[in-house]
């Protein structure tokens, strides 16, 4: 019997901030930024390769996102839920985070809780970062939205986009709030050749 234990990347980041360390390390005091880079460029890439292979065959899916309150469903039921999601409109679970340029527009208009600071980011359509809530009746499973991309890439992307980007969702939908905040940071994205040779990523990022 194969039980695949999973967790959302946002929850991993929150645990980094609480002092928890990376996979199979004991570096609790490592700066949060360094933990994130290790996860983003190494651990999550390794894990995604394993996930892609196991997704069609595991017997049970274990959601460990809610600490101390795991949820488990049969693998067949989980895959059926992903199939249904791919065939209809769906909404990802958004998350909001403060930053150096953060403002107050999102806090006011989205009725966000007071955090003693600001809100700079809204991630609301990034399968690599956001999650989905799947209702199985007896339990609700929170699962990385990236799993849907891996399970049904052509249904989500179409043949042409899938041929170019493979099992990756090439668009990031997020909102940056600077209202009554600071100037937005200068962002520099490398050329495709550079990001491929230095970071082993398939494509670079353009912004609009």
Listing of model-derived features with the role each one plays in the protein:
Residues 2-20, 24-28:
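Conserved phosphate-donor/acceptor-positioning beta-strand/loop module used by diverse small-molecule
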């Amino acid at each position: 019997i194969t039980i695949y234990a999973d967790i959302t990347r946002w929850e991993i980041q929150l645990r980094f901030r609480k002092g928890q360390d990376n996979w199979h390390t004991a570096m609790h005091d490592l700066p949060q930024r360094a933990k994130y880079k290790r996860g983003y460029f190494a651990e999550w890439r390794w894990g995604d390769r394993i996930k892609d292979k196991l997704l069609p065959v595991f017997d049970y899916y274990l959601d460990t996102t809610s600490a101390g309150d795991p949820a488990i469903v049969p693998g067949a039921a989980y895959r059926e839920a992903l199939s249904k999601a791919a065939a209809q409109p769906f909404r990802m679970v958004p998350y909001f985070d403060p930053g150096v340029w953060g403002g107050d527009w999102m806090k006011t208009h989205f009725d966000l809780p007071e955090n003693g600071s600001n809100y700079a980011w809204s991630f609301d359509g990034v399968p690599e970062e956001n999650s989905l809530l799947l209702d199985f009746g007896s339990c609700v499973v929170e699962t990385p939205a990236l799993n849907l991309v891996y399970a049904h890439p052509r249904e989500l992307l179409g043949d042409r986009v899938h041929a170019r980007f493979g099992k990756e969702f090439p668009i990031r939908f997020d909102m940056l709030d600077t209202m009554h905040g600071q100037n937005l940071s200068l962002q520099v994205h490398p050329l495709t050749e550079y990001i491929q040779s230095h970071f082993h990523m398939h494509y670079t990022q353009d912004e609009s």
